[in-house]
């Protein structure tokens, strides 16, 4: 059975993560990506009474990252074995760009896997690392 495609999507606009220490996470993501903080806080959709978010942006990179604090947060570390998010992957142009990101991660003292090359089911390379709340992040280049 062939599925019909929906309307066109031009890309992912942003992602948002709930974090245990908003200030520490804002500083970490700003250091890594060089993002600017949007100068106001956003109320968390459908949790306005307990949560709010900060948005970090860089139009040059075409990326926006939302970080949310919530008073109902129990302070547990992220675990991809629970229902919800597994990881977030950032595409880069090629393996040389991956090497540049490895150097950046090393400069900031962020532990990572190093570049891992895969051939199946297609040729790609990744670098995997984690944010302060243990959310798995990766850079990926195809080819």
Q: What positions do the PLM features span?
A:
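N-terminal beta-strand motif that seeds the catalytic metal site of vicinal oxygen chelate
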Residues: 1-26, 49, 85-90, 143
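Vicinal oxygen chelate
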Residues: 1-8, 12-20, 54-55, 59, 76-143, ...
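Short catalytic micro-motifs in class I SAM-dependent methyltransferases
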Residues: 14, 33, 138
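Acetyl-CoA-dependent GNAT
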Residues: 68-74, 142
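A short, acidic/glycine-rich surface segment
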Residues: 39-42, 72-77, 114-115
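Core segments of cupin and vicinal oxygen chelate
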Residues: 18-64, 69
């Amino acid at each position: 059975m062939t599925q019909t495609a929906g309307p066109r999507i031009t890309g992912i606009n942003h992602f948002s993560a709930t974090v245990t220490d908003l200030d520490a996470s804002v500083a970490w993501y700003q250091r890594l990506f060089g993002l600017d903080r949007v100068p106001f806080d956003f109320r968390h959709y459908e949790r306005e009474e307990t949560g709010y978010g900060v948005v970090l942006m860089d139009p040059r990179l075409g990326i926006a990252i939302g970080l949310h604090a919530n008073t109902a947060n129990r302070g547990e570390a992220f675990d991809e074995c629970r229902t919800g998010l597994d990881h977030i992957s950032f595409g880069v142009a090629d393996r040389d760009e991956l090497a540049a990101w490895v150097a950046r991660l090393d400069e900031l003292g962020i532990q990572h896997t190093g570049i891992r090359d895969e051939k199946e089911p297609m040729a790609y390379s990744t670098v995997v690392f984690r944010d302060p709340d243990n959310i798995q992040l990766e850079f990926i280049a195809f080819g």
